[in-house]
Amino acid sequence: YKIVRGAYMEKERERAKEKGYPSPICKDKATTDANFNDCLTYILHHLNDISIFIGTHNELSTYISMELMQQLNIDKTDNRVWFGQLYGMSDHISFNLAEQGYNVAKYLPFGPVKDVMPYLIRRAEENTSVAGQTSRELSLLKAERKRRKSN
């Protein structure tokens, strides 16, 4: 399973309306985060039955994942657990996970521009609102550029 937060909100709302059931979208970010972390915990406790792709740009969820894996004695290289971020976003998370030996992938959406652009805009908007991570990520990118120039 691939777990993500907020990636399919419009589709889920439309589907719920079409099928006549209440929207499954959480009322606020705190509830969304709690749901994400609960799903993460459940899946990591049931890896014999489920594999997981943890699609997150959220540092706290990444730390929670790493802590749970350690507590449950799940090896960093276990092929049933992968982390992923959108190409060009949260590179500091991807780099540090890979540096520590975790399975990491960058994903790159593709398809017709009319389908891909709204998705990318949503991702960018969501990531600028993640507790000031955008300015922090920019400073990390500048530091990395400086490091590369000096080597």
Model-derived regions, located:
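Positively charged, amphipathic and often flexible ligand-engagement surfaces
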Residues: Y1-N151
